[in-house]
Amino acid sequence: MAENDGETIVPDEQCNLTASTPMKSSGLEQVESPKERKTSMVECDDEGNPSSGTPDESPKQLTPHSIPPRRRRSPRRPEVSASRLPLKVLNQIFQYLPLKDLRSAMLTCHSWNNALSMEDSDIWQYLLGKKLPEAAVSDPFLLAELGSAKKKLRAWYFAWNTSDISRNNYIRTNGFTVHRQPVAQSTDGVRGKRGISKGVHAFDITWDGPLGTVAVVGIATKHAALHCVGYVALLGSDDQSWGWNLVDNVLMHNGAQLGVYPKMNNPPKYEVGDKIRLIIDCDTHVAYFERNSEFLGIAFNHIPPLRLYPAVCAVYGNTEVTMVYVGSPQMG
Amino acid sequence: MSAEVAAVEIQEAPVAAPIMYKVESNDGTVFEISDEAVKQSNTLSNLISTCAPEDVASMDPIPITNVTGNILKMVIEWCEKHKGEALPVDDDSVPKHITVPEWDTNFLKIDNEVLFDLIVACNYLDVPGLMNYGCKMVAMMAIGKSPDELRIIFAIPTDEEDEAAERAAKEKAEAEKKANAEKDAAEPSTSK
């Protein structure tokens, strides 16, 4: 009863748990396809240039120019070759390449990888200036923790998905903050642009504005619903999503409550504006949270090997949630 | 009548006689480049900016110690072709976009190794126009290719090939050392 005092509208007792996502399946598949290709780029970044990242070679014609024969060259002769071009020259060549080709260039040889690993070089500054909205670049706090242009560009590719979102949510012009409109008797969610299936990934999530009766952060497959009628902890209500309701600190999965988190007596309530870090370890199939850099314990384990997206669901009108991808968290 | 003829002669003089500067490559070949063409290279322009025109004829050639003769010849040929043109100004498109004219496309249809030498020479001589075209040509070879394809196109050895080459070089050095040791061992027995 006390929880309802802050609500202007009393929620119905009946809830429609079978509400379907407003997205069309064909639309989802279209959105999914480019993500598949881009995911390997970030995985390579996280894993430090793994050999398994090499794609298959296609039989198509390689170049309109004649290909010089692969002559063995003594490693001691300092001849100019593509792999020994000066850094300034490499940067000029890479400025003509789109992002996908920059990934191929990073995997070609060490010197090219070194040139493109300088995360504040002109190439990444250019791409950052063109890809990110002005509202994100000019916000001094939004991406403050990301130290390089390349990391900020990467965060953009993981931000909230403008085409995979409940109809009552919209994404602000900075591209990283979702805003829930004041609609009665509705639970509304959003997914990130890109899912993850390998490696360890961290997302910084900040809830601005009141929580209401439901404020869930967690992970979801692409099949999890993002909308339903009523005020429901939608994230975690089925086997496609896992959620942590910040209002009562309860973990949810497959419609079942998994207990209070952090697992202690009277865990502290979420303070609006605190930074929550969601960490998904796909290799050991666990997910957990940190709050203001403090580890809170394992939240979910035995997560199936699916492609998982960061997600939130909200019920309070005009509340906002910001999510910034930070890559692999620093351990220890 | 004679005054008119004299005026015409005076007017024609500057057009007929461009100042020619001499540059020397690292293999001793001397080339000439006109004062208009020199402006395409910021490095050369800075070198000659303090030279009085009347002293040019008696000057020694400007030594360019890290560019070979054939590459320097190509750079000068390109500069002569584009003399009088403004230096390119970078737009801020991403990826960078530039259109390579037909003459320059044909000019740059050369072996990849020569193209890379040319680009490095442009980097040193600071010829931004040819630098842009050369880098664009290399980038066009790279667009849409996988890493394996890039290694084939640009003759970049993989780590395994590098290790194999180093191992072969090491074995060769050891074999030479062994042969020398045997030779040294043979000589004392002969002297005995």
UniProtKB/Swiss-Prot annotation, chain A:
**Tissue specificity comment:** Expressed in GABAergic neuromuscular junctions (NMJs).
Matching entries from SMART domains are given as: FBOX, SPRY
InterPro entries according to UniProt: B30.2/SPRY, B30.2/SPRY_sf, ConA-like_dom_sf, F-box-like_dom_sf, F-box_dom, FBXO45-Fsn/SPSB_families, SPRY_dom, SPRY_FBXO45
- On whether Translocase is a keyword of this UniProt record, the answer is no
GO BP terms in the entry: dauer larval development; determination of adult lifespan; negative regulation of apoptotic process; negative regulation of axon extension; negative regulation of axon regeneration; negative regulation of DNA damage response, signal transduction by p53 class mediator; negative regulation of gene expression; positive regulation of neuromuscular synaptic transmission
Query: Which SUPFAM superfamilies does the record match to this protein?
Result: Concanavalin A-like lectins/glucanases (SSF49899), F-box domain (SSF81383)
**Summary of the knockout phenotype:** Synaptic defects that include both overdevelopment and underdevelopment of presynaptic and postsynaptic termini. Abnormal morphology of cholinergic and GABAergic neuromuscular junctions (NMJs) characterized by uneven distribution of presynaptic markers snb-1 and unc-17 and post-synaptic markers GABA receptor unc-49 and AChR unc-38. Also, formation of abnormally large and small synapses. Frequency of spontaneous miniature synaptic release (mPSC) from cholinergic and GABAergic NMJs is reduced.
Gene Ontology CC: neuromuscular junction; neuron projection; presynapse; SCF ubiquitin ligase complex; synapse
Gene Ontology molecular-function annotations: protease binding
What superkingdom does the record give? Eukaryota
What keyword terms does UniProt attach to this protein?
Synapse, Ubl conjugation pathway
Q: Which locations, inside or outside the cell, does it occupy? A: Synapse
* Positions with biased composition (Polar residues): 15-28, 49-64
Coarse class of the protein's main subcellular location: other
**One matching Pfam family, short form?**
F-box
* Residue ranges of every copy of the B30.2/SPRY domain listed in the record: 138-330
Residue ranges of domain F-box in the record: 79-127
The pathway that the record names for this protein is: Protein modification; protein ubiquitination
Sequence segments annotated as region (Disordered): 1-82
Q: Is DNA-binding included in the keywords of this UniProt record?
A: no
Family, as annotated? Belongs to the FBXO45/Fsn family.
Describe its partners and assembly state.
Answer: Component of an SCF (SKP1-CUL1-F-box protein) E3 ubiquitin ligase complex composed of cul-1, fsn-1, rpm-1 and skr-1. Interacts (via SPRY domain) with scd-2 (via cytoplasmic domain). Interacts (via SPRY domain) with convertase egl-3 (via C-terminus).
The protein's job, in short, is: Component of a SCF (SKP1-CUL1-F-box protein) E3 ubiquitin ligase complex which is required for the restriction and/or maturation of synapses in GABAergic neuromuscular junction (NMJ) presynaptic neurons. Promotes NRJ synapse development and synaptic transmission by negatively regulating the daf-2/InsR pathway in muscles. By targeting convertase egl-3 for degradation, negatively modulates insulin-like protein ins-4 and ins-6 processing. May stabilize synapse formation by promoting the down-regulation of scd-2. Regulates axon termination in PLM and ALM neurons.
Protein name as catalogued: F-box/SPRY domain-containing protein 1
Source organism per entry reads Caenorhabditis elegans
Q: Which gene encodes it?
A: fsn-1
